[in-house]
């Protein structure tokens, strides 16, 4: 991991973690090392040597601004090749076509439109409650080259609003989505 206070990468925590795995009978084939910065060749060699894997089997799981960049990052570091070699499939595997991944990233960096959707739910304060719904809206936005901004609205906050206050709350929304749920709380 990258230690910000020291301003450098430290390999010892990874070495110790792999040692514990080996004590439990688990031998790593590949190391995916979480890091904010890329691993240098020296760090890869050192980790490979002390963790009993090849330097090519040490891959940085870099922090990225967009989750859809991860396959491209792993490909750039050769993880796909290492996996194919491990399973004896490298010689017969076709060259990967990453065009769609590049298109997704390009679309997300250059949306042509923007839309705001209100999601009215009972548990909007819990971050992962509507995760699949959020991702579905993001995917729909990518398909339409449109950035989807979601306004999370707790359903109970709407119960006692006047019609005018409700209209003001909904002003600026291109659409409203009410996820399915159980019970009547907040949805009447």
Regions found by a protein language model. Name each.
Residues 1-188:
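N-terminal beta1-alpha1 cap of cysteine-dependent amidohydrolase-like domains
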């Amino acid at each position: 991991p990258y230690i910000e206070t020291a301003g450098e990468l430290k390999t010892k925590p990874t070495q110790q973690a792999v040692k514990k795995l080996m004590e439990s009978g688990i031998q790593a084939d590949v190391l995916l090392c979480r890091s904010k910065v890329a691993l240098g060749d020296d760090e890869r060699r050192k980790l490979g040597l002390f963790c009993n894997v090849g330097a090519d089997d040490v891959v940085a799981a870099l922090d990225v601004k967009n989750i859809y960049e991860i396959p491209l990052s792993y490909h750039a570091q050769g993880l796909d090749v290492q996996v194919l070699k491990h399973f004896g499939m490298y010689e017969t595997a076709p060259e990967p076509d990453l065009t769609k991944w590049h298109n997704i990233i390009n679309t997300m960096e250059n949306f042509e439109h923007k839309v705001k959707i209100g999601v009215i739910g009972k548990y909007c304060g819990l971050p992962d409650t509507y995760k699949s719904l959020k991702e579905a809206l993001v995917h729909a936005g990518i398909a339409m080259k449109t950035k989807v901004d979601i306004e999370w609205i707790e359903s109970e906050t709407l119960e006692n609003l006047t019609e005018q206050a409700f209209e003001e709350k909904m002003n600026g929304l291109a659409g409203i989505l009410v996820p399915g749920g159980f019970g009547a709380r907040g949805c009447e």
